A protein has these predicted regions:
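Transmembrane beta-barrel strands of outer-membrane/channel proteins
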Residues: 3, 42, 58-64, 104-108, ...
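Outer-membrane beta-barrel translocator domains and adjoining extracellular loop/strand segments
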Residues: 68-75, 115-121, 128-130, 173-179
């Protein structure tokens, strides 16, 4: 977006005497795409005390995902993801006192590519002018999480905690700079 289109210079560029913002649609028909995403999921959980001060929570989310992106530009690859994922979560909490806990948790989460990341064409970022090209071969990212936390409940609604965590990413979705 150029300064020529904002403020006093807009009169010279646009041939009008009004101030404002001018946006020109320079997109091409071939850069259109159709995308659909369906996610069907269920969740189950158990929360049970193991001892007076020890609590165990386990759960799993099961997701069936279908993601499809097709460009209007014939000859381009079709972006498609079809996955069935089981995402477990385990949590163990030990009550040191009635106001203090030690907690450890293990879980698996995921991140899916957006339609634009999966769509097989170049798009220009409106604000910065940066051109990004989607990759129809992207896969979803699986993330394994491990957390340790000390919690101190000062009063109702107030919490002080100290945490440490570890994350492992499988098939991370990353932006790659490829200058022309």
């Amino acid at each position: 977006l150029s300064d020529d289109y904002i403020g006093q210079n807009a009169m010279n560029v646009l041939g009008t005497s009004s101030y404002g913002l001018y946006v020109k649609d320079a997109s091409e028909e071939k850069n259109n795409y159709i995308g659909t995403q369906n996610i069907f999921a269920s969740y189950m959980m158990v929360d049970m005390p193991l001892a007076e001060k020890l609590r165990f929570i386990a759960g799993a989310r099961i997701e069936s995902t279908s993601l499809f992106v097709e460009s209007d530009d014939e000859g381009k690859d079709i972006g498609k993801l079809t996955n069935l994922d089981i995402l477990p979560a385990l949590n163990l909490t030990y009550a040191l006192t009635d106001k203090m806990n030690l907690r450890t948790a293990l879980s698996r989460t995921l991140a899916r590519p957006t339609f634009r990341e999966l769509a097989p064409f170049a798009s220009e970022d409106f604000a910065g002018g940066e051109v990004k090209v989607g990759n129809p071969k992207l896969e979803r990212t699986l993330i394994d999480n491990l957390d340790f936390r000390w919690e101190y409940f000062i009063k109702s609604g107030d919490l002080v905690s100290l945490s440490a965590f570890y994350k492992k990413f499988t098939n991370p979705i990353e932006v790659v700079d490829n200058p022309v």
